[in-house]
């Protein structure tokens, strides 16, 4: 599987999901179950690479503003939800996290923990076995510069305007 095919699967599941995107992981899992096991493994590898690439302080600051606080686990869920928004939203946010202010938010929870498990659950449903380890190691620390609450709000005024500071 290549990255364009990965994004086609993610975006088609998003298009079929309810506006809140809460059922997107379930739809994605069903799409993955129609693929050969090696393709499911490759999907998970690409997902993991993208998830790791988004482990950045600037995105964590954006998540903190959007979610009204954001723990380490919450940030993992946020990054999974960011991938679920699709290719354009994902890469725009990596370039400028402030672009997340342009995303529709009515009823949408940016964090989508279940996206983390869609491929693994699909693999288990198809093979009856656990997903093999692809050897990708999560970064020890986020990339970029640390932030505090005041600097995060100043850096992303468009997010503060849309989501407030909670």
Predicted regions and their residues:
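Hydrophobic/aromatic-rich, well-ordered segments within soluble, folded domains that form packed cores
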Residues: 64-94, 100
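Short runs of predominantly hydrophobic/aromatic residues within well-ordered alpha helices
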Residues: 3-6, 25, 40-47, 71-75, ...
